[in-house]
Regions:
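C-terminal cap of metal-dependent C-N hydrolases
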Residues: 127, 145-180
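Extracellular/periplasmic catalytic domains that process cell-envelope and extracellular macromolecules
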Residues: 36-37, 85, 144, 165-166
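Active-site core of metal-dependent hydrolases
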Residues: 1-77, 91, 96-97, 117-119, ...
Length: 180
C-alpha cells in the first residue's frame, strides 16, 4: 500500500500503519527518515509532480498552485537528498496526471533524480529493480536468467549520460516479455 504523505505527521502515521511506500515525502524529518529506513519503507519522490508545475508556471496554471509549488519545491528536494544520502530505499513514480506531468513521460523522472545528485546507476536501479521490488514483481526489473525480458533499448550509455533514457528521442526499441 502507498500513502501520498507530504507532511511529517502524515509520513509517520503512514509508516507506523505499515505502508509499503511514501509518495512525495515533501516535509520529511530525520525522525521520518529513521523510521522509514528501520521499517524498509520506500520513498517514491514524484519529482515530476512538483518540477513540471514549477517549470510550466507561466503556462496557465492557477496562481495558488504555482505559489504552493514555489514554497515546497526546495524542501521537497532537500527531503529526497537527505533520504538518498542516508541509504533509504527509493522507487520511481511520477504522480502522472498532475499539471504538465503526462502518462508515458516517466523517463524524465530519471533526469530529475540525477539533477539532485542521485547517481545515474542508482536512478536506473530506482526506476527498475527497486520499482519492481516495491510492486512485488520479483521476476522483473533486472536482467537475470528466468526473469521477464523487459528492456528499453536506447542510443547512448545512460550510466554516462542519463539523457540516453530520459530523452525519449534516444529510445530505439522496447522489448516486453521478450518480444520486440
Amino acid at each position: 500500500c502507498a500513502s501520498h504523505a507530504q507532511g511529517a505527521a502524515g509520513i509517520l502515521n503512514a509508516v507506523r500503519a505499515g505502508m509499503d511506500s511514501i509518495e512525495h515525502g515533501i516535509f520529511m524529518t530525520q525522525e521520518c527518515l529513521e523510521e522509514m529506513i528501520e521499517k524498509g519503507t520506500y520513498l517514491v519522490p514524484t519529482l515530476a509532480a512538483v518540477n513540471n508545475i514549477f517549470l510550466n508556471r507561466d503556462n496557465g496554471i492557477p496562481a495558488f498552485i504555482v505559489e504552493k509549488t514555489i514554497r515546497v519545491r526546495e524542501r521537497h528536494h532537500q527531503s529526497i537528498k537527505m533520504f538518498y544520502e542516508a541509504g533509504g530505499k527509493m522507487a520511481m513514480g511520477t504522480d502522472a496526471g498532475t499539471p504538465f506531468n503526462f502518462h508515458g513521460d516517466n523517463s524524465q523522472e530519471l533526469k530529475y533524480m540525477v539533477d539532485l545528485g542521485i547517481s545515474n546507476s542508482d536512478a536506473l536501479k530506482i526506476s527498475t529493480a527497486n520499482a519492481a521490488d516495491l510492486m512485488g514483481m520479483e521476476d522483473r526489473g533486472q536482467i537475470r536468467e528466468g526473469d521477464f525480458a523487459d528492456l528499453l533499448i536506447v542510443s547512448g550509455n545512460p550510466l554516462e549520460d542519463i539523457s540516453a533514457v530520459a530523452d525519449r528521442g534516444n529510445h530505439r526499441s522496447v522489448i516486453k516479455n521478450g518480444l520486440i
